[in-house]
């Protein structure tokens, strides 16, 4: 986590400077969420409500701005300062606070504590719980503070079982203990996950439109064997807060997992539009929200279009995210994660001539350079230029060996070496196939699938396409239709309605003269591929 932690330290350093660089304004399109606080100033109440809404939407810097405005309007409001401290705190996308950030949150919380005697009993409980999360000690164990806060929030939740915000924040505190790891790779809930789901479901039964509960419920279920549980939440978030780009985007996490790639693309496109409008009004381009969440929308958009077979739109989104992220690399090295996506889209659609016309990446982007060589090797193999492919493969192998074992190239904690290992196995498979050694090619495809299966969950997935598509195609082309059928069915378990695997399954059944359900599968494929702008064939895994 070394590189990831460095990135978040940088992000935290710019986070407060953006939050305090301009006064907050009341923003349109954020829904109607309300949490009554002790204040006689109606505008302070409105800014507090906006701040809490923005926390629920992971726009923490704008939330901090709103809470600070509430504190300016009512300097005696303990909950306004509680809100500042909450907004400065961690979430599943940023659990490692730097010491200055921790200090600022601690100071805001101390101010809230000093005003707490004039607050209500329930407000004091909120403030006292959050006090467990921060410390003046720069060398404090942040994970222990997170656990102490979660325990305190459990107490608040039990003391006020009808307080839906307390329940929602309690569930989030549990999620922060295992960020992006609510489920094991084999689909078992990790510690606390069942409690998270039970608490959020209890909130949604009483208030189906609760912004935070809908948001967190999608995150709590998306990597589970049951992502469809959150379909109702996804549908609600499409319209509950149209001005909150990240909340507009969130349905895509569920839609992608249930195989509705067109809906996932639509959610991300609408979210990107909402964020552009926000940047125009707020002048916050270059903020943490811009760097992380807007780029995430575009990245996810490219991935959604790619799954649906829409090359033109996938390439457009990939080019946009790479161009947007590139200027950030000096200050945010992890933004390089987005830069190779135009390369990946070309490989995904087998645009080999276009791959070979790509210029070399600029110096300083080691992973992008490695993936550029991977793409070139794949293109040369597809064209039968084996010597050139093997030369590119050697460069890729050297890059993997020279990459430190602890370096991550991921927002989801995956190691760079593992991603390069996956690329190397895929390239080996393509070179073996180009040589006519299909048995060896299948072996490499199987190794690649095994590596991909061990990647931590991320959405969109950390590797740009499901490698079982290629393994299934290789088996089918090698006359092993029965094994291909098994592989395509396994892929459809992980990527429901994946049109390429539906097509492969259809062809493998036809090759075995199996007629049961063939027409149903054909219709399902035609629906899934309806927005594609390219023909589909199995001749080039």
For each of these PLM feature ranges, what is it?
Residues 54, 88, 132, 174, ...:
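Residue at a conserved register position within TPR or TPR-like alpha-solenoid repeats
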Residues 42-50, 77-91, 118-138, 162-183, ...:
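Amphipathic alpha-helical repeat scaffolds of TPR domains
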Residues 48, 82-83, 168, 215-216, ...:
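Alpha-solenoid helical repeat scaffolds
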Residues 72, 157-159, 204-206, 236-243, ...:
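Solenoid-like repeat scaffolds
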Residues 78, 85, 89, 99-117, ...:
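TPR/TPR-like (Sel1-like) alpha-helical repeat modules
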């Amino acid at each position: 986590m070394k590189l990831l932690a460095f990135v978040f330290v940088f992000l935290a350093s710019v986070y407060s400077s953006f939050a305090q660089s301009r006064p907050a304004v009341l923003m349109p399109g954020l829904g109607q969420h309300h949490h009554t606080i002790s204040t006689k100033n109606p505008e302070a109440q409105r800014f507090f409500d906006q701040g809490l809404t923005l926390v629920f939407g992971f726009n923490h810097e704008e939330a901090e701005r709103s809470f600070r405005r509430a504190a300016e309007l009512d300097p005696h409001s303990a909950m306004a300062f509680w809100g500042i401290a909450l907004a400065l705190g961690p979430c599943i996308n940023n659990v490692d606070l730097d010491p200055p950030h921790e200090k600022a949150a601690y100071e805001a919380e101390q101010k809230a504590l000093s005003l707490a005697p004039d607050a209500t009993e329930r407000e004091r409980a909120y403030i006292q719980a959050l006090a467990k999360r921060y410390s003046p000690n720069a060398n404090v164990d942040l994970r222990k503070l997170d656990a102490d806060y979660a325990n305190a929030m459990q107490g608040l939740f039990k003391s006020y079982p009808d307080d839906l915000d307390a329940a929602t924040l309690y569930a989030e505190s549990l999620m922060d203990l295992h960020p992006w790891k609510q489920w094991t790779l084999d689909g078992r809930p990790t510690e606390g996950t069942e409690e998270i789901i039970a608490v959020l479901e209890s909130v949604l039964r009483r208030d189906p439109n609760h912004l935070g509960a809908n948001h967190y419920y999608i995150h709590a279920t998306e990597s589970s064997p049951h992502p469809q549980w959150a379909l109702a939440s996804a549908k609600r978030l499409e319209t509950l807060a149209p001005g909150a780009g990240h909340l507009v985007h969130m349905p895509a996490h569920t839609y992608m997992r249930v195989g509705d790639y067109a809906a996932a693309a639509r959610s991300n496109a609408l979210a990107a539009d909402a964020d552009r409008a926000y940047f125009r009004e707020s002048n916050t381009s270059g903020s943490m929200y811009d760097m992380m969440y807007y780029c995430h929308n575009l990245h996810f958009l490219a991935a959604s279009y790619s799954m649906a077979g829409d090359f033109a739109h996938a390439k457009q989104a990939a080019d946009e995210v790479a161009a947007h992220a590139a200027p950030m690399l000096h200050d945010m090295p992890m933004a390089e994660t987005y830069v190779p996506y135009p390369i990946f889209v070309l490989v995904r659609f087998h645009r080999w001539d276009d791959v070979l016309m790509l210029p070399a990446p600029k110096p300083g982007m080691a992973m992008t350079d490695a993936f550029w060589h991977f793409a070139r090797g794949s293109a040369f193999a597809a064209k039968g230029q084996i010597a050139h492919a093997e030369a590119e493969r050697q460069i890729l192998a050297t890059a993997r060996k020279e990459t430190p074992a602890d370096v991550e190239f991921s927002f989801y904690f995956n190691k760079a070496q593992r991603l390069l290992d996956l690329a190397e196995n895929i390239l080996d498979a393509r070179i073996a196939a180009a040589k006519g050694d299909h048995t060896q090619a299948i072996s490499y495809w199987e190794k690649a699938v095994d590596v991909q299966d061990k990647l931590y969950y991320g959405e969109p997935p950390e590797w740009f396409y499901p490698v079982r598509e290629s393994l299934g195609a290789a088996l089918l082309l090698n006359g092993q239709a029965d094994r291909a059928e098994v592989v395509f069915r396994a892929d459809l378990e992980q990527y429901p309605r994946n049109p390429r695997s539906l097509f492969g399954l259809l062809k493998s059944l036809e090759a075995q003269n199996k007629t049961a359900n063939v027409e149903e599968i054909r219709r399902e494929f035609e629906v899934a591929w309806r927005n594609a702008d390219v023909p589909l064939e199995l001749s080039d895994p």
